[in-house]
Amino acid sequence: MDKLYSLQNGTDIRGVAYKDDKSDLEITLTREDVKNLVRGFATWIIDKDKKDHIKISIGTDSRLTGPDFRQACVEALTEIGVDVVDCGMATTPAMFMSTIIDGYKCDGAIMFTASHMPYVYNGLKMFTSQGCLEKSDLKDVIDICVAGNFVDGNSKGNLIEKDLIEDYAQILVDKIRAGVDSPENYEKPLAGMKIIVDAGNGAGGFFADKVLARLGADTQGSQFLNPDGMFSNHIPNPENKEAMASICQATLDNKGDLGIIFDTDVDRAAIVGSDGRPINKNALIALISSIILEEHPQTTIVTDSVTSNGLAKFIKARGGIHHRFKRGYKNVINEAIRLNEEGRESHLAIETSGHAAIKENYFLDDGAYLISKILVKAAKLYRESQDIGQLISDLDEALEDKEIRLKIEDKDFRSYANKLIKSLSEKIKDIDGWAEVADNYEGIRVDCYDEKGWFLMRSSLHEPLLVINFESDIESGCDMINEKLTALIK
């Protein structure tokens, strides 16, 4: 049972769950592990909420082991008296919503997913109505599993099957209709628009027919909507260059007004403009920031640490406050929540990875909700013969960017990285044309004036790696910065 600790990846459980002749990896997450983990989760809820009887919803993305793990979950939970709401194929954000929306209001929710990881992986994300379990909460669940202190049910729990995605999709449809509030065509505010969806064979295919088509959009030309746990076409990841190239080309080929791409479990997304240009990473943050700032002037936009100087300038020009924080979507979300609790208004927490959480939506990182928010604005602009990309026409984007990941051999890799960063901070003071950025919350960020760029050096969140991100506005600028930096840290 102790091995369960090694499966914890921040706020998630992840492991190798499937083996075939294409993979050399050994299975680390088994059916029995799943049973123990969900029993531990149920026990944790019962102990926390002081309830005798609870209800937990379960769902999966398109991964090959999803159905078997879902069945194992049903068996384990009903055996200890827990009622189970089987939502079938779902999305991670929808599973959270099952803890709060009428007709569900589950005490907990479990999503089987491993995000954009290769097909052999699977994992679990656990929710209550307060959101995804924190890292410390998940450890408490594993502690219960290791100790074997599971609750005993007096009677067998009930199994209820519900179409959560249908109900969740209707929430999005209603949101878009109300947001556009079209006097000409309230029911179908996207009529006339051509919108291409790429679900990457994950769980996001529903968005084309259950949301866009119902709103009048033409989605012909959409691709990889069918669930396929082998992810045969491309990795379902808005940060992946191949995936973005695929949706960009599909948008151009089909003369789309907009392209949309989701990751496997739909907690992340990105879009493509009618010109085929990707709107992800800094551009996506700029776009949704522009929309949020129209509704909430001067609000604080919390981002991760690797956002560009051009983005900071863009947000400031629109009257917003850019709070550049740490990597890790949970870090970014929790920071926005903290700022609000301190009286500093923040309506958006977003990572360059495409995780975006909006205050009005429970600070839930929800790719489909993010896209719905953008679609409301896009529909209004379409009626004025304008394109969504015009909102970020003045965003300064770097000529080049680069990321280097260096393996740290030292066993105490965090301590090693911290010492290296501290030493570098001292050396930077003697480098003409370089200046350490003062308001920085992760690693060290340095503006490089001669190279018209910057770099950020930090320790990886989960791996023994030193990660260095670069941007520059001149050709070969990233290499120039790296060459100078390498000489400093040798």
How does the language model describe each region?
Residues 1-73, 79-80, 158-195:
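An N-terminal, well-structured beta->alpha segment
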Residues 5-19, 199, 203, 348-352, ...:
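Conserved phosphate/anionic-ligand binding catalytic regions in large, soluble enzymes, centered on
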Residues 43, 55-121, 210-272:
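N-terminal small/polar loop signature for handling phosphorylated ligands or for N-terminal nucleophile
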Residues 78, 87-88, 92, 142-174, ...:
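Proline/glycine-rich low-complexity loops and linkers
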Residues 103, 120-254:
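Gly/Ser/Thr-enriched, mixed-charge loops and adjacent short helices
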Residues 119-146, 272-288, 361-372:
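A short, gly/pro- and small-residue-rich
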Residues 297-490:
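Phosphate-binding and adjacent anionic-ligand microenvironments
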